[in-house]
C-alpha cells in the first residue's frame, strides 16, 4: 500500500537552480523512510524543471505544496502542485498537479 507525506514548499525554492535542491529533497525522503538513488532523483528534477518552465522568462511558478509517496512495490512517486500567483492579490490560480516518478534504492 501507499504512504503519503505532505510538506509545504517555500517561495525561495523557485529561485533555486535546479528548482528544488537535491541536498534538500534527499534528507526529506530519508526522514520518511524512503531512500532514493541520487542519479534517478537528479534526472527527475531536471525533467521537472523542463515541465514547469523553470529558468525561463515566463511567469514564475511557485511550489505550493508537495507530497512524497512510497509504495510497497518499490516504486516511489513525488507529486508537486504548481501554481501561478496573481500579482494583484497574491491568490493561487491555475493549479495543476505534476507527477514525478523516482526510483528508490532496493
Swiss-Prot record:
Q: Name one GO cellular component term.
A: mitochondrion
**Recorded superkingdom:** Eukaryota
> What keywords tag this UniProt record?
Mitochondrion, Plasmid
Q: Does the keyword Mitochondrion apply?
A: yes
**Chief localization class?**
mitochondrion
Tell where it localizes.
Answer: Mitochondrion
What is the name listed in the Swiss-Prot or TrEMBL entry for this protein? Uncharacterized 11.6 kDa protein
Supply the source organism for this entry: Claviceps purpurea
Amino acid at each position: 500500500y501507499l504512504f503519503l507525506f505532505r510538506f509545504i514548499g517555500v517561495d525561495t525554492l523557485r529561485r533555486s537552480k535546479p528548482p528544488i535542491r537535491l541536498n534538500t529533497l534527499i534528507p526529506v525522503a530519508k526522514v520518511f523512510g524512503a531512500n532514493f538513488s541520487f542519479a534517478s532523483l537528479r534526472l527527475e528534477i531536471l525533467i521537472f524543471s523542463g515541465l514547469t518552465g523553470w529558468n525561463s522568462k515566463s511567469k514564475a511558478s511557485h511550489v505550493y505544496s508537495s507530497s512524497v509517496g512510497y509504495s510497497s512495490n518499490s516504486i516511489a512517486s513525488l507529486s508537486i502542485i504548481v501554481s501561478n500567483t496573481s500579482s494583484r492579490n497574491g491568490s493561487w490560480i491555475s493549479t495543476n498537479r505534476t507527477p514525478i516518478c523516482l526510483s528508490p534504492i532496493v
